[in-house]
């Protein structure tokens, strides 16, 4: 918290007119276990324009002193809570991925809830450890209290939303937890995932139910009023920005093949823009999501290929 206050004071010194807006500043959070070099490179880039809370295990503690706008919080502060342990006891894995991997994805939201409560924050912008921010999130004009990516294309039981770039408040967490309980504990809403469970099981198709399924259901069932960050968003000056779903996939707001694509990745234009080939519009880029095998591209040299 001391590092955050220092960061805020620095902003005032650099730009006194920002003082009235300090309380509206949106902090970022990453939850990760086990050191990976790409996480270090992410923090170096993302923390240039954003204050980042890093919730992780002992292997990540050194990163909190390496970057001035990064504050490390030991994950044990949240992971060992009685409530989290109780929720884990109710979890059943309906996915071809491992139990531990899928549970941790769910647990992130439970931990964010407790983090917001303990640190008395109104909201936080969650980013995955392989998702780099190129802009100051606080400069964006969010239209709703909660905002994340929900692909327009939901065919073949995709049922997917993503908070790899997600504005989250306590209400989001509480409604996610309630939906989790209705599906996994009292099973009053198990029917919402039953067809998808059967689809993957009977057709022997990899994947299944995950935290992303519940993000999708929160929106589809109108449990939560959300802004879909799959679509363009403006900053305070009126410039249009867009969030990337996956660096290795050209899917965007206008379909599966929206963005200009070269070889195996979305084309980055002028170091921080992308081009929608369907709408024929160029957008400022909010993020780059190095999902899956693309993580190897987030290396010590990548920062020289972009502007942030």
Predicted regions and their residues:
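Surface-exposed cleft-lining segments at the edges of enzyme active sites
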Residues: 95-101
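GT-A fold catalytic core of metal-dependent nucleotide-sugar glycosyltransferases
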Residues: 104-150
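Short catalytic/ligand-binding loop motif for oxyanion handling, primarily in non-cytosolic enzymes
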Residues: 62-64, 133-136, 141, 158-160
